[in-house]
């Protein structure tokens, strides 16, 4: 994120906090539930629902921008399955919105011309080939590496996200070495019982001792590896896994989730709850006057954790976000 954009977002964040205003500054938007993989811990493809048309998406983007949205993360499913993704990305960019897209990498080579306007392409990277493919599907490791190289060659900034399970908890050193080799900022989070996870998610949990030891090592590694995205605050929070604690949550205050059918939610942990709001049935502005808060006992989503700490005006996580612009 460029300095001026950081300054604008920081100002809006501070305004929202000091004056207790609800601003949809950050929006995570599932454009589709369709996916061309079936990861072991995800059941999103089983969530059948309609999708907004490109014209409907444009209308929502117009309103979001007027209300203060400056960062949109397009996700799914696999958003590159939408044939109109280039129109959606380019429309958001013309509004001055910072656009991130989450992908499994399979379609990046085919759709590279359609995503050149992205600010960030985030890819899943779970470890050595045999482990990554075990968690996400045969051939997925090669797809991620190819997608990363093609995106970088086209001057698209790439991030990785790693989901820690019992299969890769002992292989994080491999990931540390690879992200330094590739120079890819990477976030880490535990596999967790979120609302669209597979029913046997517990079988993928790492042992508590193994996970906590891995986080301890990650804290040490971060001192010499600038490509670990997690702030020290979030790593210390994660070191208590699986015991979670409530933290001040930004969801429904400065961040919102839009589901593939246009439903408006505080975050993706509330996807099984109907708040009765939909982009197609009214104005997003009306939602801001309502109390649309997520109620949970804690959070293991790294993006949410980092934004929670930033909203709480914790200096280290804020500086950790800003430094990404200067990471080579």
Task: State what each model feature region is.
Residues 2-111, 325-328:
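Conserved alpha-helical substructure of the radical SAM core
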Residues 24-26, 159, 296-301:
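Short, solvent-exposed beta-strand edge segments and adjacent coil->beta transition regions
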Residues 40-43, 132-133, 269:
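A short local structural element in Rossmann-fold oxidoreductases
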Residues 49, 79, 106-108, 128, ...:
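Residue-level marker for beta-strand->alpha-helix junctions and adjacent short loops that shape enzyme
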Residues 57, 211, 284-287:
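Hydrophobic/aromatic residues in well-formed alpha-helices
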Residues 95-98, 119-120, 124-126, 130-255, ...:
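Radical SAM enzyme [4Fe-4S]-AdoMet core and its adjacent flexible, acidic
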Residues 115-116:
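A short, aliphatic-rich alpha-helical micro-motif
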Residues 184, 226-328:
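Accessory C-terminal segments flanking Radical SAM cores
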């Amino acid at each position: 994120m460029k300095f001026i954009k950081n300054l604008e977002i920081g100002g809006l964040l501070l305004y929202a906090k000091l004056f207790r205003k609800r601003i949809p500054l950050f929006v995570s938007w599932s454009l589709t539930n369709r996916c061309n993989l079936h990861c072991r811990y995800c059941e999103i493809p089983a969530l059948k629902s309609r999708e907004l048309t490109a014209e409907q998406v444009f209308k929502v983007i117009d309103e979001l921008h007027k209300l203060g949205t400056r960062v949109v993360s397009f996700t799914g499913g696999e958003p590159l399955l939408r044939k109109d993704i280039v129109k959606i990305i380019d429309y958001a960019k013309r509004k001055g919105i910072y656009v991130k897209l989450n992908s499994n990498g399979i379609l990046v080579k085919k759709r590279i011309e359609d995503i050149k306007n992205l600010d960030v392409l985030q890819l899943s990277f779970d470890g050595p080939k045999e482990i990554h493919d075990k968690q996400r599907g045969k051939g997925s490791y090669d797809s991620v590496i190819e997608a990363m190289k093609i995106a970088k060659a086209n001057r698209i900034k790439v991030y990785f996200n790693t989901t820690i399970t019992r299969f890769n908890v002992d292989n994080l050193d491999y990931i540390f070495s690879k992200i330094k080799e590739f120079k890819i900022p990477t976030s880490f989070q535990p596999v967790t019982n979120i609302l669209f996870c597979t029913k046997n998610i517990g079988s993928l949990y790492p042992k508590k001792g193994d996970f906590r030891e891995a986080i301890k090592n990650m804290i040490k590694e971060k001192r010499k590896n600038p490509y670990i995205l997690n702030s020290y605050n979030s790593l210390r929070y994660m070191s208590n896994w699986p015991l979670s604690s409530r933290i001040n949550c930004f969801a429904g205050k400065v961040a919102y989730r839009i589901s593939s059918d246009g439903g408006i939610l505080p975050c993706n942990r509330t996807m099984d709850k109907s708040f009765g709001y939909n982009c197609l049935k009214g104005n997003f502005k009306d939602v801001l006057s309502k109390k649309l808060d997520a109620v949970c006992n804690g959070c293991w989503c790294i993006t949410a954790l980092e934004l929670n700490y930033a909203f709480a005006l914790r200096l280290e996580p804020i500086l950790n976000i800003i430094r990404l612009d200067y990471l080579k």
